[in-house]
Amino acid sequence: MARWEVVVRRWLLRSSLLLVTVTAALAATTLPAMACGEEQTHGPHTAAARSTGAPGAEKNVKAVGNVPDAQGAIALQFLQYGNRDVMVVSGEFGLKTYDLTANPAAPKLIGKLDMPGMWETEDTEVDPLRKRVFLSRDPRAFGGNVRTGESGVYIVDLAKPEKPTVLSYVKVPAGHTTSCINDCQYLWTGGPAKADSQPAEWGGRPIWVTDIRDPRKPKVFPQPIELARNDGKTDYVHDVQIDAAGVAWASGRGGVRGYWTEGMHKDPVTGKVRPASPTDPVPYAGGGINETAAPSKFMHNSFRPVGSMAPDGGSAGHWGNGNLIYATEESFLDGCAGDGVLVIASLEGSYGGEGWRSTPQKPYRLKTIGTWGVAGQEGSDPASADCSAHYFDVRDNVLVQSFYAQGTRFLDVSDPTNPKQIAYYRPADAAAWAPYWHRGFAYVADNNRGIDILQLTA
């Protein structure tokens, strides 16, 4: 590249935007504000040197290990083989497996499945019983694009972690993320923005259901679900998380909505009791997030502290156990202050199907009780505009969350109305995507650095 050219990295190394290269004559042009999931965003990145302001910063945490050969990492999972502890890493390279048994701070590479150009495998899930991994193929994988690219799911056998083996691949009309439903007998696959072949009125791809009870012959159901989620408009479903009570929470543009996927339940929309299934789930609760907390309306992932996980998510107080939802807003605006934040909302008032009746004329929104963003916080780089919240994990009232170039942040959420930062780790070259609590450490999938292994010191 000639010296007089510049690389605009406003959206470099973030899961929602493309690398844009322009000449110096265009460098001063104001780039439009976007959120994850706009027409051509959240695609593969081109590696480039990071331009940083302040050097790296850390407090109350130390790095005990790093796995640089996992550069391009996007998601992690952990599988147990008797006394053997194996970490599964998915990313732009495909899949890698590491043995943590002898030393969890020094993962040992034991196997890999090479898929160069893979995208995106975000929040990759595993079947811990059958030892399988589900890799979601975004239409932008292998040089494709949102409008016409192929999407689908790879089912990978990890019975022998040294030899990851593809059992099957199935084309699916969505492919940004895929999630286990009903103990990994089914998959829900959603996102990204809509293809040219999909209805023009859609804002993004909803969820398609795949029956994987026979993993060598997966069956995709033709009719999508989780429609009309954005005030009556079918829109981008980004990811799904299952809470400890078995409710599947779908996050995306328009908020977070929960569903029963098995058993008999009263449908709050119809008022009738009916069986729930992966292909015909029963609405439970949830709805849009108030725009004063999340102006983009694009919710990325969520966590509901309930059941065995209730103690992890802070004091429910007068809201009652199971009535809180933690959710990431992923959004990128010019500068840092307007980027996506962590939102904590109350589910009170949403159990009657309100989130399914919401319209632009009569919108329904959950009540926000707390938020936290990285802009202006101790440890942040004021020169970086790469500040959106991303994936998080919660244990014992400590929420660890990735903020891309602003690194990894540890928050005390014992009072959900007032999350407080207690530690941070921000290397100068950070591209933190997803943290995971495991064996007392926080393992961070960093798209630039590989895997950072962190330990709180206070």
Can you describe what each PLM-predicted range is?
Residues 1-11:
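N-terminal secretory signal peptides that target proteins for export/translocation
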Residues 4, 15-458:
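Feature marking well-ordered beta-strand scaffolds used for ligand recognition
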